[in-house]
Amino acid sequence: RGIRRLDLAVSTHIHEDHLCGLLRAARITPPAVLWQTLPPDLYRSLRPLDGSVARNLSESKFMQALNDYGTLCALVEDHGGTILAPKSGQELVIAPDLTVQILSPSTKKQLALADEINALYNSANVCSTFLQRLDALDARMNNYSLILRLNYRGTRILLPGDTNVTGYDGIDPADLRADLFKVGHHGQKDGADEALAELIRPTAVVCCASSDRRYNSAHPDTMKLLADHGAALYLSVCPPVPGMQI
């Protein structure tokens, strides 16, 4: 589409559906800056994981994402780019009239994630321990997501990655107020609840959902909850929600 430059790319967290496509885009147009959630030089100590030890598709995908994370970071630096790990509390002007507020992860969360990553790789030679830690980190990874609130000329946009309802701890409730909410975790059942909807009070909700509903994305209960709070719903590819016109 004629895009010749990427000033900024954001990797919210290390899961296949959020990172592997970003690597493909970066190979075409390497970004000048990469935001992600780990110490910028940690990737250098991560050796490639052997996906053949995976016992199921989830483990295989997660190992691929971890490998692609290292490849992405190396690609950015090899092309003269900068890797950053924004922290909660920062507010950055990234373009005229556009500011980004970093809501999560906190320094504590970033350190915890780095510790989990290091422990995982240090156990790679003990298959049973490695796979146990792999599954545990996979289950927790969503709530290590980078959470951003954009403000463009007074319109606030909340982008929580795959954060579920338990992952907003430590964030000032006032900072969650937004006009547009990209519902977390693809609109699955744990992507929003009554309390979160009351805090955000969005007028519009965007849900990025898979069409096969394999992971129960765009869950009807979640969509109805947000619509009942007055939000207009905008969805990607997913089947109609019974009883609703989307």
Protein language model regions, located:
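Flexible, acidic/histidine-containing loops and adjacent segments that form or flank the divalent-metal
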Residues: 20, 24-158, 236-246
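Class I S-adenosyl-L-methionine
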Residues: 73-77, 172, 223-227
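An exposure/low-complexity boundary signal
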Residues: 43-47, 161, 224-228
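C-terminal regulatory/interaction regions
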Residues: 216-246
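Active-site-proximal loop/helix segments of hydrolase catalytic cores
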Residues: 1, 6, 10-29, 109-218
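Catalytic cores of large soluble enzymes that bind and process phosphate-bearing ligands
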Residues: 14, 60-68, 214, 218, ...
